[in-house]
Amino acid sequence: WPMSTPERPKQFIDVLGTGHTLLQLTADRFEGICPVENIWVVTSVRYRELVKAQLPGIPDSNILLEPCMRNTAPCIAYAAWKIKKKDPQANLIVTAADHIVMDVPEFKRVIREGIDFVKSEDRILTIGMWPTRPETGYGYIKVKQEEDGAKSGAKVIREVEGFKEKPDLKTAEAYLAAGGYYWNAGIFLWNVRTVEKAYRR
């Protein structure tokens, strides 16, 4: 019997056996970064009660419901519009609810560094993960050369040259051999003003 079902997708399940679902672990990762009242969830109408049960600290007004699941862009635009009404200077972190993050302190460090960057830069920031193998299950981010990056703390924030769809094995091996390719984590950071400009273009 599958662990994840349409009635209870994997984000609502304790996949790791920690006593917390992936959704709860996602919210927990932002403790100390974002107060619970500033966490927003965009989900399908059918999962409203699951979200409320698993994240009881989130205000009902922060659970945005879609009548049916659409692609990511309209979800982000809708959430950004709602958040801007409450805080025109807000910084946004967009993440999936079903990620598994093993090194939470490092995750928090990267997110904090990213927030500091988007506070002062009119840029969209995405998180890339250093690839450890030729993985075909992830999309990739191709970055520009090192000298084109902006130093930020101990790490380098690099300009994106392009996004690559999930590759076949041969292409993934070529990415690793070439260097300058990262796994696409699907996490984005930006100021609400920046995302509004991006959607108006």
Task: List the predicted regions and their residue ranges.
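Conserved core of the sugar-phosphate nucleotidyltransferase
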Residues: 104-201
